[in-house]
Amino acid sequence: MSLVEIHAISKSYGAVQVLKDVSLEVAKGEIIAVIGRSGSGKSTLLRCVNGLEPIQAGSISVDGVKVNDPKTDLRKLRQQVGIVFQSFNLFPHLSVSDNITLAPRVVKKQAPGEAREIARDVLRRVGLEEKLDAFPSQLSGGQQQRVAIARSLAMQPKLMLFDEVTSALDPELTGEVLKVLESVAQDGMTMILVTHEMGFARRFGSRVVFMHEGRIHEEGQAAALLAEPKTPELKTFLSAVLH
């Protein structure tokens, strides 16, 4: 059974339909790179998988749990589904340690000492162990994004969703964050990433999904799809982002 099963989902904001009959399955350990123009439905798709946005038709399951079932405890589900946005969303008045340990202590009832050790471990994974007691204002944008990733990893999720996590960063800081994503990928984490980083998608993506006007327009193995796009829409998109 796939870890993520998305079947024929549709999503509208008022009269505007942003997802149209979208279906996708993601196996455990797969890395899916979702690409496409702004407004194609990429970010909305991630938010639906996490249960942050309701759908009007179809179904979404994560590890056998139906996300769109009214009986589903979404807070419990989100312990298994981490999501990192392009805005870092760190609490400015809390230290890095407290930002990371807040959810494990409150949601998973971890002891403070245990939660702090997990925080230290995930910060080590993102190369920021020495920033354990720093505050967000003392960090660069790239460091803040790495802390945001560490915060999600601290919940030990089965699935990680990344929504254009490098788009607000300067090129040199983008490299820092991509190295962390590469490390998470190499650890075997199942990931769905909305990204414009085609090099990352080519090297680490199991598959690439190209969204266009609310639909999955083209899908395939990452290297092959990016090297030989079949549709004019994908060819045009790749020409724009690669040059």
Language model: regions and residue ranges:
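ABC family nucleotide-binding domain
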Residues: 2-222
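Absolute protein N-terminus
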Residues: 1-2, 243
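C-terminal boundary and immediately downstream tail of ABC-type ATPase nucleotide-binding domains
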Residues: 212-213, 217-219, 223-243
